[in-house]
Structure formats: structure tokens, C-alpha cells
Regions:
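Arg/Lys-rich, intrinsically disordered low-complexity tails that mediate electrostatic binding
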Residues: 1-37
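N-terminal mature-domain region immediately after signal-peptide cleavage
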Residues: 23-33, 38-294, 301-307, 312-346, ...
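Domain-length cofactor-binding catalytic modules of enzymes
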Residues: 350, 357-361
Length: 528
């Protein structure tokens, strides 16, 4: 007799009432209210202002007004993701948020906590749900070290079954390697170019471009253009790409009223962690209160958890200096942020690249995995030692990381002195595979199409045709940064659409994902 799986309590409350509904075609980022920013571009624009709680309430209400089912659907997708990746439902992760993150945020970041409470009130959610949205990127890092925090006198009874399961996995090398591959896949995201100076950019100013890639399950929610205007005296305004309920960017592309642009790419295979301040709060405080690049680097390192470890890149457009033209020149900074090892570089004339690894050998070799299988190395760029490059795929062009590093270096050198936003758009839509020696839109290329890769390459967790790929592009230059704006494109950088229906026809092994996926049609550019 078949037993019906008990639906998680959170899903019974918040999931779409017709959970087992017949498959209908969704468009990634679509909203029932049609608040997508005009022109069918699928961006949802919201502006919030004032005191923390009030702007949070406004945030929640605006999302619900645009699409009453947005959070319901979002949590149902998250529940599916958690069950696929961890074998645990969303209620388990709500519990982790309440036990391990709520207290830290409430005590250390009271204004951010008030904003989260406001979002919950405006959207009729629980605070732990808003916290989960914002620590979503931190959870794979925390979970990899879960036993350290739950196998304690305080939590041993509550988490007894979980401790039993995790000890069994830890004692089984094959199970542990499989778990590591799944968690590492969640850490392999994004390509980034940031350049400045007369030797590199067309006008000597800053140019920045970033594309996100992920599984197409959680990617579909990263369509919010969020503008925050704090009350007077409480920092600077900012505009960012974000998600419903986000207090920070999550995909991490933002511009602030201090004339600073920021972005990042994750460090794949990163395995060091200490439960301190979550990245969502640290980077949000950078954005709101940071006035210089040095302040950003300092705030990121304060009580750093190693969660969502990234190569962060920031650009400061500098001062105009009045009519005499004297002022601070534009500069860019790269912060390769490990846990115990951090590499900070600045330049007034150079280029920084992001490809999910680091140039810092200490982080690559000491704080990143180097013991996974060769297949996992090709899949996530987090595998075996690669001929002197460290355990991150740094020199391995058969991996996503290695190919993108080589190709980004080639392309920025090719366009040296001519880099502008149009050139960066071209770079981020590149399909050249150095391993194959030809154009081939696949899991290795800068414009990532892992869903089209039968080899199960980079970013697909080693599984062929997994619905994973690049799904957006954002670009900015000094002029747009001064306007506190950027250009944004929703969908794969090259413009190739992704159709759920067509993918399922070709690859029915993914049909259980169909209900939770969305189409990414070809779209145009908008100014944020």
C-alpha cells in the first residue's frame, strides 16, 4: 500500500493550495500583478524608504500586491530544493534559522532584524521564513558543519535523529563525497569582470559586469530590482538585484549612493566555517554604511563566518574634485574572502575577474576541497589537486572554473583599452570552450549552459542535462554608478531562451523538476 508523504507544516500553511496541480508554463520572474518593469522584461521593481520596520512592511506588501502567490510558490520550490539536496524538508531549515540565526541577527543587527520583522508583517509570513530567505546562501556552509553545532548538550535531544543520520554519513566515505558534491554545486555561481584605468577601459573609468548562474529552481526568484532609501542619517541609499523578502542582493550586484558598485563570485569547494555573523547582514551593512573601499573590506572581515565565501569586488568612482579636476581617482578592490585567509588588492589601473576560484593559493589549497573525485572536479571545479593550481580547478580547462578563468583573461586582454559596458556584455555571453578548442555553449563556458551538456560538466553536479545555467546579466560604468543605476538583462546572457517543456521532452529524467521550473524567454535590457 502506497503511503502518501506527509506535507511539511510550513507547506500546508503556505504552499499553493493545488500543490499537485497540472503542469502549467511559468515564466521565470513572472508576476501575476504584471509588475515586471515594463516591456515584458520580467523585472519586478520595488522602492522602500523610511525606518527599518516601515520599509520592511512596504517591501512585503509590494511583493504581495504584484503577485499574491509569490512567497507561497517560492517556499514550495525551496522545500523541493531542500528535499533534493539534503533529504530534509523546509520545516527543518526553519528550525535551524530559529535556533542558530535569529538570535545572532536580533542581537548584532537590530535594524536589519526590524526590517525583517516588517517584511514578515507586510507579507503575512513568520520571521523565520524571512530569515531563511536571507541565509539561504549560507545554509550549505553551515550544513556541512552541522554536527559541530547540534551535537551539544543544548541541542542533542532535539536533534537526536539528525545527529544519528549525520554520524552515519560522516562514517561512510562514499556518502560523504556525494553530500560534498551536492553542497559544492550550490557554491559554484557567477562570472564577473571589473576594470578601471586608461590601460583597460574606454574612458578610464570603472566598468563592471556580472552574470549569475544556478539551478533554474531558485534562479527564477532573483528578478527583484530593490531600491532602498533609509531614513535621514541612517546611511546611504542603494539599488540592487535581489529576491522577494531580501534585505541584501543575494546574487550580489548593487550600486550605492556613496558612488560604490559591488559584486562577487563564490569560491567553489570552500569548506571552512565558523558560526558568527551571516553574510547577508555583513554585506548589507557595507552597502548602507560603507563610504570607502577600505570600510567594505573591514566590515566583511568582522566576525566573518566563511559562509558564502566569495571573491568580492568593489569599485569607487572617486571624487570630481570641483572645477580644478582634483579629487580621488576611481579605484577598484578585490577581496578574496576566506575564513582564516583573506587577500585584498586595489588598483587604479587594472582588471579583476571572478570565476569561482581565487588567485590566492592559501585559500585554494587550505580552505577549499581537494579530495573529491575527478568527476566532481570536472563538475564543480572543487576536486583533485590540479597540477599546482590548488584544489579548485584553477588550471583545469576541462572544468568550469579553469575554462572561464582562461577565457576571461584572454577576452579582457583582447579588449584592453576598449572595455565598456557593450564589451562586457559581449564577454559575458561568450561560448568558447578552451578544452574542446571551439565554440560550444556548455557547462564550462562563460555563458554557462549546463542544461545542454550531456557530459555532466561544471555547475551541474556531475549530472548530464541538469537544469542549470546563466540566467541574467548586469553591467555598470562610472556614469551609471554616479546616477545610482545599472543596466540589467533577465535571461541567459547570450539571449538563448530556456523552455521547460522542450527540455522535458528531450530529458524526461528531470520531469519531477518540471512543476517547480520556469521558462527563461529572450528578453531586453532595462535600466535599474
Amino acid at each position: 500500500m502506497k503511503t502518501r508523504r506527509k506535507m511539511p507544516r510550513s507547506s500546508r500553511i503556505y504552499r499553493h493550495k493545488n500543490t499537485q496541480r497540472k503542469r502549467t508554463t511559468r515564466t521565470a520572474g513572472s508576476t501575476a500583478g504584471g509588475g515586471g518593469g515594463g516591456g515584458g522584461t520580467e523585472w519586478l521593481r520595488i522602492t522602500i524608504r523610511g525606518a527599518p520596520y516601515e520599509r520592511g512592511v512596504s517591501h512585503g506588501k509590494q511583493i504581495i500586491a504584484a503577485d499574491p502567490e509569490r512567497f507561497t510558490y517560492m517556499f514550495s520550490v525551496y522545500d523541493f530544493l531542500f528535499r533534493q539536496g539534503y533529504g530534509r524538508d523546509i520545516d527543518f531549515f526553519y528550525g535551524l534559522c530559529e535556533d542558530f540565526y535569529l538570535g545572532i541577527i536580533k542581537k548584532r543587527f537590530p535594524k536589519i532584524f526590524k526590517e525583517m520583522k516588517g517584511i514578515a508583517a507586510g507579507a503575512k509570513l513568520r520571521v523565520c521564513q524571512v530569515i531563511l530567505i536571507n541565509v539561504f546562501m549560507s545554509l550549505p556552509y553551515f550544513y556541512a558543519h552541522l554536527l559541530r553545532y547540534i551535537d551539544t548538550p543544548k541541542y542533542r535531544k532535539k536533534y537526536a535523529d539528525v545527529i544519528r543520520d549525520e554520524l552515519a554519513i560522516a562514517a561512510n566515505p562514499a556518502a560523504l563525497a556525494a553530500r560534498s558534491r551536492r553542497l559544492d554545486e550550490m557554491k559554484d555561481r557567477c562570472s564577473l569582470v571589473m576594470a578601471v584605468g586608461e590601460d583597460w577601459t574606454k574612458d578610464g573609468g570603472i566598468v563592471c559586469g556580472h552574470s549569475s548562474f544556478s539551478n533554474f529552481l531558485d534562479a527564477q526568484f532573483c528578478n527583484v530590482i530593490l531600491r532602498i532609501e533609509p531614513e535621514a542619517g541612517d546611511g546611504v541609499p542603494m539599488v540592487m538585484q535581489s529576491v522577494p523578502g531580501g534585505i541584501y542582493s543575494m546574487t550580489d550586484f548593487f550600486v550605492t549612493g556613496a558612488g560604490i558598485v559591488g559584486s562577487e563570485t563564490t569560491i567553489s569547494g570552500f569548506n571552512a566555517f565558523a558560526l558568527r555573523d551571516p553574510i547577508c547582514c555583513r554585506i548589507r551593512e557595507c552597502m548602507q554604511y560603507g563610504r570607502t573601499l577600505e570600510e567594505y573590506a573591514e566590515r566583511l572581515q568582522k566576525r566573518n563566518s566563511g559562509d558564502y565565501a566569495c571573491s568580492w569586488m568593489f569599485g569607487d568612482v572617486g571624487g570630481h574634485g570641483g572645477h580644478g579636476g582634483h579629487g580621488r581617482p576611481p579605484r577598484i578592490m578585490r577581496v578574496e574572502l576566506g575564513l582564516n585567509y583573506v587577500n585584498v588588492e586595489t588598483t587604479k589601473n587594472g582588471v579583476f575577474l571572478g570565476f569561482n576560484s581565487t588567485y590566492d593559493e592559501r585559500i585554494r589549497n587550505i580552505e577549499c576541497s581537494s579530495s573529491l573525485s575527478e568527476k566532481a572536479n570536472h563538475a564543480t571545479g572543487a576536486g583533485a589537486i590540479d597540477g599546482g593550481g590548488g584544489g579548485s580547478g584553477f588550471r583545469d580547462v576541462s572544468s568550469s572554473i579553469g575554462n572561464r578563468r582562461v577565457q576571461l583573461e584572454k577576452l579582457t586582454e583582447k579588449y584592453r583599452g576598449r572595455i565598456d559596458t557593450d564589451v562586457v556584455k559581449r564577454i559575458l555571453s561568450d561560448h568558447y570552450d578552451n578544452h574542446l578548442g571551439k565554440m560550444a555553449a556548455n557547462s564550462r563556458t562563460v555563458c554557462k549552459h549546463a542544461y545542454a551538456d550531456g557530459g555532466g560538466g561544471g555547475g551541474g553536479g556531475g549530472v548530464p542535462f541538469k537544469p542549470v545555467g546563466a540566467y541574467d546579466t548586469k553591467v555598470a560604468d562610472s556614469a551609471s554608478i554616479r546616477r545610482m543605476s545599472f543596466l540589467a538583462h533577465w535571461g541567459p546572457p547570450c539571449g538563448t531562451p530556456f523552455s521547460v517543456r522542450e527540455h522535458m521532452k528531450k530529458h524526461p529524467e528531470w520531469k519531477d523538476w518540471a512543476e517547480y521550473l520556469a521558462d527563461f524567454p529572450k528578453r531586453g535590457w532595462v535600466e535599474a
